[in-house]
Amino acid sequence: MTSDASQDGPDAVAGSGDRAVAAAAERAKLTAARNIPTFDDLPLPADTANLRHGANLHDALLALLPLVGVWRGEGEGRGPHGDYRFGQQIVVSHDGGDYLNWEARSWRLDEDGQYEEPGLRETGFWRFVSDPEDDPSESQAIELLLAHSAGYVELFYGRPLTQSSWELVTDALARSRSGVLVGGAKRLYGIIEGGDLAYVEERVDADGGLVPHLSARLSRYAG
């Protein structure tokens, strides 16, 4: 099958690129002025999800810079009772330290795309492994530590695949007495066409294999 791009020729590709750049610039006029709310009476740097404001991003986090911001959109999930749609907001912020703050919360959508009920929620931190005792080949390993509202804590390790995509795999998982029983996961995040943040998550099922669990495409809301 021949793609539309090859049929239309280089001019069409260039035109599409120009339109995408123009659309991104227009969105940036709105998102550039937005940031997360903070209290201004604390004696330490405030969290910011906008690289134009607040503390400078720590040099160790430059490979994660595209993630910083507030992202909103919709996705699809697969649970024990079948497939479902959800809305989601992800906030990625920093205070100048050598880690990123991560907060993701979602809500179930009904057949009409309207809010139905609260969904999954997680909070945690991204950083790069920098232990001098580690193997030098591990110097660019990403560490993601998450606490889930469903009652478990999860530790991921991974690597940047490109300047705008990152892959992580569960290394350890601990469940509370009230927590749901889940298997490990594999996640792939990436900045895609139009500047959106997209991701897919697969989780280990009862048979021990990775199966699709979550996927979403989120647009930048702030930052």
From Swiss-Prot:
Domain note: Forms a 10-stranded antiparallel beta-barrel structure able to accommodate a hydrophobic ligand in its interior. In fact, this fold hosts the heme group, which is located in a wide surface cleft.
Role of this protein: Heme-binding protein able to scavenge peroxynitrite and to protect free L-tyrosine against peroxynitrite-mediated nitration, by acting as a peroxynitrite isomerase that converts peroxynitrite to nitrate. Therefore, this protein likely plays a role in peroxynitrite sensing and in the detoxification of reactive nitrogen and oxygen species (RNS and ROS, respectively). Is able to bind nitric oxide (NO) in vitro, but may act as a sensor of peroxynitrite levels in vivo.
Cofactor binding, note field: Binds 1 heme b group per subunit, that coordinates a highly solvent-exposed Fe(III) atom.
Cofactors, names only: heme b
The organism of origin for this protein: Mycobacterium marinum (strain ATCC BAA-535 / M)
Family: Belongs to the nitrobindin family.
Highest taxon listed in the record's lineage: Bacteria
InterPro entries assigned to the protein according to its UniProt record, in alphabetical order: Calycin, Nb(III)_bact/plant, Nitrobindin, THAP4-like_heme-bd
Protein name in UniProt: Peroxynitrite isomerase 1
Disulfide-bond pairs as recorded: none
UniProt cross-references to CDD domains, sorted A to Z: lipocalin_heme-bd-THAP4-like (cd07828)
